[in-house]
C-alpha cells in the first residue's frame, strides 16, 4: 500500500502536488515502514470509500493496532498531506484506519493497488 514513486501524468498534475517524500525517513525507518506495510495491509478485511479518502477495516487485535499506529506515524512523516485516523470500535469491534485529506487526496489514493 502507498507506493511512492509515481510517474508524473497529466492526471496527477491536475490533482495537485501530492507526492510522498521518502527522504523524510531515514534508512531504518524506511525499511521498517516497508516491512509493516507488507505485513499489515494484506490483513485488511474491507476497503470503504469515504467522501475524502478511504477506510480500511482490520480485525480487532491489540498487536495489529500497535503496528498500524507505528505505520501511520512513519507514513505521516513522508506523506504529511494525509490525515490518518485509527479507530477501535466499541464491544471489541474492528479497527478502522482512515486515510483522508484535502481535495485530490482521494484520487491520489485511488492509484494505489488494492483500492
Model-derived features: positions:
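Amphipathic, interaction-prone secondary-structure segments
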Residues: 65-69, 73
Amino acid at each position: 500500500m502507498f507506493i511512492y514513486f509515481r510517474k508524473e501524468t497529466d492526471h496527477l498534475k491536475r490533482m495537485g502536488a501530492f507526492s510522498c517524500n521518502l527522504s523524510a525517513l531515514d534508512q531504518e525507518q524506511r525499511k521498517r515502514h516497508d516491512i509493516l506495510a507488507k505485513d499489515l495491509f494484506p490483513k485488511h478485511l474491507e476497503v470503504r470509500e469515504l467522501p475524502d479518502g478511504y477506510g480500511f477495516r482490520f480485525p480487532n487485535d491489540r498487536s495489529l493496532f500497535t503496528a498500524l499506529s507505528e505505520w501511520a506515524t512513519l507514513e505521516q512523516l513522508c506523506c504529511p498531506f494525509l490525515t490518518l485516523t485509527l479507530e477501535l470500535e466499541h464491544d471489541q469491534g474492528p479497527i478502522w484506519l482512515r486515510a483522508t485529506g484535502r481535495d485530490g487526496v482521494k484520487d491520489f489514493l485511488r492509484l494505489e493497488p488494492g483500492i
